[in-house]
Amino acid sequence: MPAETVRKEVALEYCRRVNAGELEGVLQLFAPDALLVDPLGTEPVVGRAALAARLAPALRGAVHEEPGRPYAAHDGTSVVLPATVTVGAPGAPPQRRGRTRVMGVIEVGEDGLIREMRVMWGVTDSSWTARPAPDEERRKELAREHCLRINDGDVDGLLKLYSPRIRFEDPVGSWTRTGLEALRAHATMAVGSNVRETAGLTVAGQDGRHAAVTVSATMDYLPSGPLLARHHLMTLPAPADPHRALIGIEYVMVIGVDADGLIDEMRAYWGATDVSLLDPAA
């Protein structure tokens, strides 16, 4: 399984080659039978020939991808990369270029090649298609509201956002838990560690179901730090003063929303390289 740093570098290299207009170079980053879904909710294209046909018009339109920081996972394959994409039709003047905020969920194989890329962006995330889309905004608001209720220590209020059929994985690659009682235990531990979350970029899928948000979180080292280390989810050295130390976690939360408007799926993408010890005096 490729290391977290390798997966992150593959995602960033994709942006570099796209920005250089290197179609063949871009294709060489993908497995021969790779799958691309862009945007999420449309039909996938499979294989390098189909990828070439899909990517060539964007490269002719001088597409430019400004990547954010990449996020890993503990499954040995995943990396998530937020980006701001600008592109125009081939030959169009600069003032007619569109701007889209996206989140790419990428799977990298043992050979270091991209096996799957699913790009999440909604009509509310692009200047090309910007129009009212209450369903997208509702999903994005649910993702942000999760962070607010955690910050308020409102576990009961948090559970009201979720379906009794919730399945969640935090972090991706650990283990999948199901049901509201499992979520209550998970959230109670977070609140007990004084978690504070700041939501960042939020995007929607065009599948009528998903949304994603980048999150910067801090928490007390105790009591959760030793537990994270025990499960090999964190590889930081023990702090000199664990009672004062803080942990920082940068992650992406992807949610799925059911027909009742409740979250029935939650995946948190973060790896060991997304965790840090913070100076409590800073």
UniProtKB/Swiss-Prot annotation:
Pfam families: SnoaL_2 (PF12680)
InterPro entries documented for this protein: NTF2-like_dom_sf, SnoaL-like
Positions contributing to substrate binding: Y14, E65, H146, R177, E197, Y251
EC number in record: 5.5.1.-
GO BP terms in the entry: antibiotic biosynthetic process
Domain of life of the native organism: Bacteria
Sequence segments annotated as region (Lsd19A): 1-133
Site residues by UniProt (Raises pKa of active site Asp-170): H186
Site (Raises pKa of active site Asp-38): R54
Domain remark text: Consists of two highly homologous domains, oriented in a head-to-tail fashion, that catalyze epoxide-opening cascades independently in lasalocid biosynthesis. The N-terminal domain (Lsd19A) recognizes the internal C18-C19 epoxide of the substrate and catalyzes energetically favored 5-exo cyclization, while the C-terminal domain (Lsd19B) recognizes the internal C22-C23 epoxide of the substrate and predominantly catalyzes energetically disfavored 6-endo cyclization.
Summary of the function given for this chain in its UniProt record: Epoxide hydrolase responsible for the double epoxide-opening cyclization of bisepoxyprelasalocid A to form lasalocid A, a polyether antibiotic. In vitro, accepts various substrate analogs differing in the left segment of lasalocid and epoxide stereochemistry to afford products with excellent regioselectivity.
Record-given protein name: Epoxide hydrolase LasB
